[in-house]
Curated annotation (Swiss-Prot):
Gene name of this polypeptide: lbp-8
Transport is among the record's keywords: yes
Subunit structure: Monomer.
Annotated localization: Lysosome; Nucleus
Stated role: Lysosomal lipid chaperone which binds to a wide range of unsaturated fatty acids, including high affinity binding to oleic acid and oleoylethanolamide, to transport them into the nucleus. As part of a lysosome-to-nucleus retrograde lipid signaling pathway, translocates into the nucleus where it activates the transcription of genes promoting longevity and activation of mitochondrial beta oxidation.
Free-text tissue specificity from the UniProt record: Intestine.
CDD domains the UniProt entry points to: FABP (cd00742)
Protein name stated in the entry: Fatty acid-binding protein homolog 8
Positions of transmembrane segments: none
UniProt main location, coarse: other
InterPro entries: Calycin, Fatty_acid-bd, ILBP
One Gene Ontology term of the molecular function aspect: oleic acid binding
UniProt GO cellular component terms: cytosol; lysosome; nucleus
């Protein structure tokens, strides 16, 4: 079983599938979708006490997320949409449930896990699934 602390570190995106399609599914505009799809962000994961930090850095936009496991919070996404979010850790995976606050927004589920020394993520909204692969820096 993977320890939560094994996620800590800096991870560089090396492969992405369906990211632009995922952004389209959740209603992100064309120009932002194109710009975001061309970046290769670094994901920095830290633990401070019982607060996790998933900070994403890129030439396009930086996004910082701080949360406690199993504690609901309001998340402001990079496109300024607000979500009620709950993150759990189950079977070696961080699972983030992003529930829409406004009716015209879309809910998503993000899953993050480690496999063969890589950090893998899926983003799912509706029937669209994005897959991302990171390697440790």
């Amino acid at each position: 079983m993977v320890s939560m602390k094994e996620f800590i570190g800096r991870w560089k995106l090396v492969h992405s599938e369906n990211f632009e399609e995922y952004l389209k599914e959740i209603g992100v505009g064309l120009l932002i979708r194109k710009a975001a799809s061309l970046t290769s962000p670094t994901l920095e994961i830290k633990l401070d006490g019982d607060t996790w930090h998933f900070n994403q850095y890129s030439t396009f936009k930086n996004n910082k997320l701080a949360f406690k496991i199993r504690e609901k919070f309001v998340e402001i996404a990079p496109d300024e949409r607000s979500y009620n979010t709950l993150v759990t850790f189950e079977n070696g995976k961080f699972i983030s449930h992003q529930d829409k606050i406004k009716e015209n927004h879309h809910s998503s589920v993000f899953t993050t896990w480690l496999e063969n020394g890589k950090l893998l993520q899926t983003y799912q909204s509706g029937s669209v699934i994005c897959r991302r692969e990171f390697v440790k820096e």
